[in-house]
A protein has these predicted regions:
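Short glycine- and hydrophobic/aromatic-rich loop-to-beta-strand nucleating segment
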Residues: 21-24
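Substrate-binding clefts and catalytic carboxylate motifs of secreted carbohydrate-active enzymes
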Residues: 129
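Type III/flagellar export substrates
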Residues: 137-139
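Active-site-proximal N-terminal segment of extracellular/periplasmic enzymes that hydrolyze or transfer
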Residues: 118-126
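C-terminal cap/loop subdomain of S1 sulfatases and analogous C-terminal strand-loop tails that border
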Residues: 1-17, 28-111, 141-147, 151
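Basic, alpha-helical interaction scaffolds
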Residues: 133
Length: 152
């Protein structure tokens, strides 16, 4: 059950991607602090923990340090998050979620529409175009799937 969010497990809609995160660190993280705006990915754990432990993170990893989010500091920008899966490739950048796939092109402002009910693709073609370009460039970087062997 994903509550107000669209989708569920194994889907790229918000309901399939959002995971609650609780951190307890007395004197560092405010006890009642809630942040439902910022997002981070599993690849961000290592560089963030390294930063908090004053350890240099490896240079050749995909994640970025997001420990400032955990500590309640306002963040200027987070790199876009990209996914490949059902219903097609997706990107989340700041307040925007863009999908391209089975349902055509979808664009949502998840800051005002976390349930992803109102497709804004026609109202914000310039936003959709920029996100589309990022998704297409990223997809070209991904390795091609290995073809299945022919049955004999």
């Amino acid at each position: 059950y994903a509550g107000q969010f669209r989708g569920g497990k194994h889907k790229l809609f918000e309901g399939g991607l959002r995971v609650p995160f609780i951190i307890r660190w007395p004197d560092k993280v405010k006890a009642d602090y809630v942040d439902s705006v910022n997002v981070f990915s599993g690849v961000d754990w290592l560089p963030s923990i390294c930063k908090l432990a004053s350890i240099e993170a490896p240079k050749d990893i995909d994640g970025e340090d997001v420990s400032d989010m955990w500590l309640g500091t306002k963040r200027a920008h987070h790199k876009p998050l990209l996914w490949k899966g059902y219903p097609g490739p997706s990107i989340r950048e700041k307040k925007w979620r863009y999908y391209k796939g089975k349902y055509g092109e979808l664009l949502y402002d998840v800051s005002t529409d976390p349930g992803e009910k109102e497709n804004l693709i026609k109202q914000y073609p310039e936003v959709a175009g920029g996100l589309r370009k990022q998704v297409e460039a990223w997809m070209k970087e991904l390795p091609r799937p290995v073809p299945k062997p022919k049955k004999r």
